[in-house]
Amino acid sequence: MLIAVLAVAIVAVPVVRWAAARDTTGRRVDGGRLPVVLVPGYGGSRASLEQLRATLVRRGIQARTIAVPGNGTGDLRASARALATAVERTGPGPVDLIGYSAGGVVARIYLGELGGAARVRHVVLLGAPNHGTKVAELAVQFRAAECAVACTQLAPGSALLDAINGDETPDGPDYLSLWTAKDETVTPPDTARLDGAYNVELQSICPDAATTHGELPRDRLVTGLVLRALDGGTLEGLGEGDCATLRAAA
């Protein structure tokens, strides 16, 4: 049961970099928009990110969701290498990254171990198990034979997570980590919190948000926050009065 949940569903203090409007927006020197590379989660389903990707494209942003090896259940470092290849294919300039669920961990491996921090402007993580998830921990304990490589790597205290959490936000990009208090897969939900990132629980802005883990990439509030972040807009001071505007932006 635990493995089924994992395979289906996993497909602090804010820093000032996103606390105020910035000159470092999601645009190239020539005024064009930076390409966005999206990284799917455990299970590797690109369909889970299609609505968000299509929204970005409608706004004139070149957006691509990568295919990860091993259906997203294999070695997350191999997925990070696939991400590095995808970024190189966008050309020599900077890019923005969006990592959903385990895809957020893949993005962080690329940033911290493969030199990606030098190429990336904005990093947006959606429900990322940055410090592991209890679901994976239980799977390792009780269903080890069914727990794929990525599953073991997502257990709290894994060697991989310990390695990338030595420096949770390597210098270079701006980091935004979003999560929902209603997350039933990445538990506890605030395992998504990162030192040096702008950390946002959806319900801290919109208490009525009932977004689950699987709904994060399709949620209108999440999309509104992602769009604002990629534009380099301020996220400080957002509250319940901004919910309608954020959702309408999607």
Located regions from the model:
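Proteins with a high burden of low-complexity, intrinsically disordered sequence enriched in S/T/G/P/A and R
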Residues: 8-25, 92-100, 104, 114-118, ...
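Serine-dependent carboxylesterase/thioesterase catalytic core
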Residues: 34-40, 47, 51, 55-67, ...
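Helical cap/lid subdomain of alpha/beta-hydrolase-fold lipid enzymes
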Residues: 112-250
